[in-house]
From Swiss-Prot:
Catalytic activity: heme b + (2E,6E)-farnesyl diphosphate + H2O = Fe(II)-heme o + diphosphate
Gene Ontology molecular functions: protoheme IX farnesyltransferase activity
Locations listed in the record: Cell inner membrane
Source species of the chain: Pseudomonas putida (strain W619)
EC number: 2.5.1.141
Gene (name only): cyoE2
Identification of the protein by name: Protoheme IX farnesyltransferase 2
C-alpha cells in the first residue's frame, strides 16, 4: 500500500471532470463578482465528496471490476488496500467534504452534494447498476449535481438556473454513458451489468443517444433564454450541440460501432468542457440579455 493507492482509488479523472462543471456553475452564479476563497472551498469540498463516493464505489464494485478489462487493475481488485481501510478513508473524505461545503458555503450546497452522494453510492452503485437497465438514468442525477453545487454555493437558491443545470447535465450523462457501454460492450457483458446496449441491443442504444443529445441541445439553450447566460454561450452551445447531434446520427450508418461510440464519447467531453467554460465567462443577468435583444 502506498500514497499512490490512496490517490488512485479516488478516481482523479472523475474528480477533475467534476471540478470543471463545479467551476462552471459557480462562475455562472457569480456573474463576474468572484469570491475566490468561497470558490476554493467549494472546489475542495465537492472534490472530497466525489472522492468519497468513488472510494465507496470501488469497495462495492470489486466483484464486478475483477471481470472487466478496464477495471481489473483497480486498487481494491489488486488487494492494494483492505476493505476496512478503504471504508474508513471514504467516510473521512465524505465528512470533510460535506463539512466544508456546509460551513464555508451554505447548507443548500451541502444538501445538493448529499443528494448526489446518496444517489450514486446508494441507489446506483449498491442497487440499480446491477439490477436495472434504468440504472444509468438514475445515476445521471448524481453526475449532474456538481454544477448545481457550484451554482447554489453562490446563489444560495435553487432557482430556474439550478434546475436547468440539473436537467442539462443529467441529459448529457446519458449519451456519454451509453457510448462508453457500446465500446466497452464486452466488459459490461462479462460482468453481467444490464446497461442499455447489453440489455436491449446496440441499435436501441443508438436511438436513445440521438434522442438524449437532441434533448440536451434544447436544454442548453435555456440558460440564455432564461436570462442567465449571454449570446456567446448560446453560440457555442448551439454549435457544439448540433455537431454532437450530427455525430450521434451518424451511428445509424456506422460500420464500426466501437469506433463511432468512442468518437461520440470523446466529443461529449469536449462539449461539456466548452459549455462549462462558456457559462462561466459569459454569464449575464436577465436584464443584460434583454438589453442585448433590444438593441
Amino acid at each position: 500500500m502506498s500514497v499512490k493507492h490512496f490517490i488512485q482509488i479516488t478516481k482523479p479523472g472523475i474528480i477533475f471532470g467534476n471540478v470543471l462543471s463545479v467551476a462552471g456553475g459557480f462562475f455562472l452564479a457569480s456573474k463576474g463578482h468572484v469570491d475566490f476563497a468561497l470558490f476554493l472551498a467549494v472546489v475542495i469540498g465537492t472534490s472530497l465528496v466525489v472522492a468519497s463516493g468513488c472510494v465507496f464505489n470501488n469497495c462495492i464494485d470489486r466483484d464486478i471490476d475483477i471481470k472487466m478489462e478496464r477495471t481489473k487493475n483497480r486498487v481494491m481488485v489488486q488487494g492494494g488496500m483492505s476493505l476496512t481501510l478503504a471504508l474508513v478513508y471514504a467516510t473521512l473524505l465524505g465528512v470533510a467534504g460535506f463539512s466544508l461545503l456546509y460551513v464555508q458555503a451554505n447548507p443548500l450546497s451541502a444538501f445538493c452534494a448529499l443528494i448526489g452522494f446518496i444517489v450514486y453510492v446508494g441507489f446506483y452503485s449498491l442497487w440499480l447498476k446491477r439490477k436495472s437497465v434504468h440504472g444509468t438514468l438514475v445515476g445521471s442525477l448524481s453526475g449532474a449535481m456538481p454544477p448545481v453545487i457550484g451554482y447554489c454555493a453562490v446563489s444560495n437558491s435553487f432557482d430556474l438556473a439550478a434546475v436547468t443545470l440539473l436537467v442539462m447535465f443529467s441529459l448529457w450523462q446519458m449519451p456519454h454513458s451509453f457510448a462508453i457501454a457500446i465500446f466497452r460492450f464486452k466488459d459490461y457483458s462479462a460482468a453481467n451489468i444490464p446497461v442499455l446496449p447489453v440489455a436491449r441491443g446496440i441499435l436501441a442504444a443508438k436511438k436513445q443517444i440521438v434522442l438524449y443529445v437532441l434533448a440536451f441541445v434544447l436544454a442548453t439553450l435555456m440558460l440564455t433564454l432564461g436570462g442567465y447566460a449571454g449570446l456567446g454561450y448560446l453560440a457555442v452551445a448551439a454549435a457544439m450541440g448540433l455537431y454532437w447531434l450530427y455525430m450521434a446520427w451518424g451511428g445509424y450508418k456506422a460500420e464500426d460501432d466501437s469506433k463511432w461510440a468512442r468518437k461520440v464519447f470523446g466529443f461529449s467531453i469536449l462539449t461539456v468542457t466548452a459549455l462549462s467554460v462558456m457559462m462561466g465567462v459569459d454569464s449575464q443577468t436577465a436584464a443584460d440579455v434583454l438589453m442585448t435583444y433590444a438593441r
